[in-house]
Structure formats: structure tokens, C-alpha cells
């Protein structure tokens, strides 16, 4: 069975990998391990720290390595390869592809073919906007402002583009619209209910990542 290590930003991403991705990947003969980023205390770390962990995993035998972190949380001083230059690229998907290429190129040449770089545009919670009906059906009318969430979903070409201000990031929208919203618990229950197929259908960059992992060669 093929093995993929996905280094995760935090518990939300780990639960998503274990509860949503893993069952599907096992059907394709692939097992997933989802360790958290080391030395982060929750959240993203500078590229140098993350790179060291990625390289250490890549030196394990017979494994591909990826990552699941939010674009929204990366700071300028984290010095991700190509970060400043990427800001000149207006198309967000092209910007992500540019960053993916720069990250891969920054690893030792002999490891690059087993590295599957990924950054979630703009953050994990954007994936939950893939099916607003699921959000509505999981809460009582007095617990959720479905109008705000539907307007956000309708405003953008796809859920990955939802983010025009720190106060209107997907997680902030969900926190305002859903009473008592818990990122780790609700995030993954909702993702499981929406289903991987629907998320892939609505989120093209995410779907590219899934395809890349499912089609890895030993």
C-alpha cells in the first residue's frame, strides 16, 4: 500500500485528513499519516522550520510527502520560497502554482519528485462553503444566519476565493453566522457531511491536490 504523509497546520486539518481523506484513499490503496507541524503551538511556522520536517519525512523510505496549511496564515517574515514575487501574480490559482513550484525547487533535488506541495486557498474553512444546504440542515434556524453564508458563496467564483478582508475570511464568516461554532468539531463534521466528492467538484485547486496524491507512483 502506498503511503502519503500530510503535514498539517493543526487539529482541524488532521481530523479532516483522517476522517474525510483517509477512507477514500484507502479504497485506492493509499494510506495517509497526518502529523501536525512541529514547534508551531498551533498554526503555521517559518518555511525553514516546516522545510526541515518535510525533508525528514521525505528521507523515510517509500513515502510521498505533502502539506495542508492555510494561505491566509502565512506571514511575510516566514520566508516561503517565492513569497514576495508571488504577490505580483493577480490570478490566485496561478499564484498558488507558482508557490508550489518554488517550494519544490527549494528541496534537495533527489527528494523533489516525492514532494506534493499544497497550500489551501484561502483557508480550510472555505471548503465548507461547497454546499450551503448542508450547513443549513445541520443547525436550527435560530442557530445560523444562512443568508450571510449564502451571500458569501454566491459572491465568489468558487469557495476557495472567499476572502477579501481579515474580518470576512471563511472562518470569521462561520464564527459570526453559526452560534457557538467550534472550528475543529463542527468543521470536520460538516466536511464529512458535505463529502469529498462535492468539495472536489466545487474547489478546483483542492481537486488538483487530491488528483496529484491519488495518482502518485511508488
Regions found by a protein language model. Name each.
Residues 1-5:
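Extreme N-terminal starter segment of soluble prokaryotic enzymes
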Residues 6-15:
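Catalytic nucleophile-elbow at a beta strand-turn-alpha helix junction centered on a G-D-S/GDSL motif
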Residues 14-37, 51-218:
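C-terminal accessory helical subdomains adjacent to catalytic cores in phosphodiester-
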Residues 35-45:
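Short beta->alpha junction loops
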